[in-house]
Amino acid sequence: MSVEQSLLGKETQYPTSYQPDVLFPIARAQSREKYAHIQGITQGKDWWHVFEISWLNAHGIPQVAIGRITLPASSPNLIESKSLKLYFNSLNFTQFDSTQSFIETVEKDLSAAAGAKVELTLFQVDDLEISKPQGICIDDLMPERLEQHPDATLLKLDESGEEIEVELYSHLLRSNCPVTGQPDWGTVFIRFKGKKPCYRSLLAYIISYRQHNGFHEQCVEQIFADIWQNLQPEKLMVYATYTRRGGLDINPCRVSDLTWMPKPIRLARQ
């Protein structure tokens, strides 16, 4: 199904009964066609934090939790965010014998939509801690030039030719939902091993997404592919933690080497 057929940007009724068929899968293949040869495009995870989870226990008493969904990057489909919100709303008045029964139902439904095994972890509402970013923040640097749309020619190696392993981050990632045009804000982490990149050029490249229309997952994959092709690292990780919208935040991560998979985190802006 095409994204134009989704409920994004459309007025909808919020369901009050269990409706797994509201979930809307979007095929990853089309946006990945030009990156098919890139190592790591299908390696990684999409982590979602769901802050508006509620269901009824066996006695009909409302339960609440924060959820972390883990969706493999190798899945044929991602799940459109508004449909996921509506799906979780449809569970608000549904009774389950146990918390485990609730988890198993959600995992079954999301796995069917994604075409791969999806996992749900629940946290008590006070237990999902806020982390501080690790690495070098590049936001105070001065880019040599600025562009209004993603431009891979901005990416340059440092003149020193030094071999390094480093983790950088920027809070300045901004892109737009390709359907509604609403801005998406995030922090992007880049772990890099190879010839030292020019940090100013990386910042300029990240800033160039500010008027780009793309889903979170697609933006991270484009960033990963452009760095991989233009800077040719030995190893690479790109991980973006986007801010919340509609009770959900999306956190895609792609790695060239599975040993570089980070643990999922939640930042202050989320």
UniProtKB/Swiss-Prot annotation:
Any Pfam family matching the protein: QueF
Active site: 177 (thioimide intermediate), 184 (proton donor)
Residue sites binding NADPH per the record: 81-82, 245-246
Annotated metabolic or biological route of this protein: tRNA modification; tRNA-queuosine biosynthesis
Residues given in the record as substrate binding sites: 79-81, 216-217
Reactions the enzyme catalyzes: 7-aminomethyl-7-carbaguanine + 2 NADP(+) = 7-cyano-7-deazaguanine + 2 NADPH + 3 H(+)
Enzyme Commission number(s) from the entry: 1.7.1.13
Molecular-function GO term, any one: preQ1 synthase activity
Keyword flag NADP: yes
Record localization: Cytoplasm
GO BP of this protein: queuosine biosynthetic process; tRNA modification
Entry's Gene Ontology cellular component terms: cytoplasm
Main location: cytoplasm
InterPro entries: GTP-CH-I_C/QueF, NADPH_dep_7-cyano-7-deazaG_red, QueF, QueF_N, QueF_type2
Keywords, in A-Z order: Cytoplasm, NADP, Oxidoreductase, Queuosine biosynthesis
Function: Catalyzes the NADPH-dependent reduction of 7-cyano-7-deazaguanine (preQ0) to 7-aminomethyl-7-deazaguanine (preQ1).
Family affiliation: Belongs to the GTP cyclohydrolase I family. QueF type 2 subfamily.
Subunit structure: Homodimer.
HAMAP family: QueF_type2 (MF_00817)
Protein name (database record): NADPH-dependent 7-cyano-7-deazaguanine reductase
Native source species: Acinetobacter baumannii (strain AYE)
